[in-house]
């Protein structure tokens, strides 16, 4: 389960910057929330995923949103 969560975090962190490049902040946050929900439906731990991306979901600018996502990439999805 731990490896599945790590893999999900890494995949989401890789996907979001590409998928949300031209989006407004609220659109990007909505896309991130949908992606997290899909992984939770696939059996990942909701608490782990939500904790990993909470800083991004609570950000107030696009720059901080993408910075938080990039931080997850640098961590390699480790919690």
Regions found by a protein language model. Give the residues of each.
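Short intrinsically disordered terminal tails
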Residues: 1-7, 71-79
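Acidic, low-complexity, intrinsically disordered interaction modules
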Residues: 25-63
